[in-house]
Amino acid sequence: MDVNVTSSTVRGTTRAPPSKSYTHRALLAAGYSDGATVRSPLVSADTKATARAVTAFGGAVEPESGERFDDADALVVDGFDGRPAVPDDVIDCANSGTTMRLVTAAAALADGTTVLTGDESLRSRPQGPLLEALGDLGVRAESTRGNGQAPLVVSGPLAGGEVAIPGNVSSQYVTALLMAGAVTEEGVEIDLTTPLKSAPYVDITLELLDDFGIEATPVGDGGDALDGAAGAAGFVVDGGQSYAPAGGSYTVPGDFSSISYLVAAGAVAAEPGEPVRIEGAVPSAQGDSAIVEIVERMGADIEWDREAGVITVRRSELSGVEVDVGDTPDLLPTIAALGAVADGDTRIMNCEHVRYKETDRVSAMAEELEKLGAKTTEEPDTLTVHGSESDLRGASVDGRADHRIVMALAVAALVAEGTTTIRGGEHVDVSFPNFFDAMADLGIAVERDGAGE
């Protein structure tokens, strides 16, 4: 689907979509339980892949009140109580890397063989460190092509034990092992061989596990317990635990990765004197809430009422800043788009791991912003956007089949002279299905071609 975005101003109130990261974890945690309700879930292409996996393991995921699955305000999960059945068929994770990694560890608990695959993009993403870790724990876990990429074959059962794993490729490996380790006989002790990147995503996992009654602990070099994942040398989760949220239900918070595009839109294109208000911005463990501090450093007029969960942002003159995205990789596209509008240089550092997402997001943003007239410099671990040298004009750009690239380019298109055509607009369904509807409600001039095809 092509989406045409014409230079526009925005105003009004919108609501953040529920968190994709929390929804994935909550659906699987409910699957590990003997039953739980997930309230305010994000129902998207990615999270539906996790729901299908829970069903494949012998659970069931249904809307609470008989509404359409896509419109569900709550999903009732009939769990498999920590003992996943061997699936009758291959588990297709579609485009969801989170699903594949979390479900690969869950598959290791089954007393038999599970096969997992995904779309072309997912079949190119690295799974090798997780497969090696499961192998070290006594599970057969292999790539059918021998390259550490899907399709994957996993044969359990997993009893638990101690394992070493790198922390600089994907924090999802840690999340997968912690979630599965809680229901093993022996528990799992994880030693990190390299410093942990994207630590806030593990904090999300630790927070959610606690809400489901699971104790998991980050530890330092001396084995002492830490308050959070940052700086951890490893993690410990005891086995034999049971997943059970208080009151039998769990409520998903708003998604700060998605909020970042709404904040950026307000910062660069709010109608003079008219703010953009974003509801549902309740504080949580999400590292991507750093977007508020980042745009404030750039000079944005922004306020965050944490108690009410409301962010208010007005258009301002922005200046370039330096940002380390080691812990917040999903913010890189948003920051790059802001940098193309700001005065001076915006230097995005510590971003090599962002190259291993749905696409190489570093190169993708550099190349697509260049099409719009931005000037960029790309290095292996750094992306610099030269805002003062940029003159954004409408052009045809490629969303690279990546939801975050599509949404970031839509933000840049708000201030590009004329009309910008973004190819692959349908991919927003991965994390923010009503993104273009929400933007249209704020006043963006948007037309969709082929939406019904």
From Swiss-Prot:
EC nos: 2.5.1.19
Biased composition (Polar residues): 1-12
Domain of life: Archaea
SUPFAM superfamilies, per the entry: EPT/RTPC-like
Membrane-spanning segments: none
Pathway(s) it belongs to: Metabolic intermediate biosynthesis; chorismate biosynthesis
Xref: Gene3D superfamilies: Enolpyruvate transferase domain
Active site: D330
Keywords for the protein's UniProt record, in alphabetical order: Amino-acid biosynthesis, Aromatic amino acid biosynthesis, Cytoplasm, Transferase
Assigned protein family: Belongs to the EPSP synthase family.
Protein name as annotated: 3-phosphoshikimate 1-carboxyvinyltransferase
Originating gene: aroA
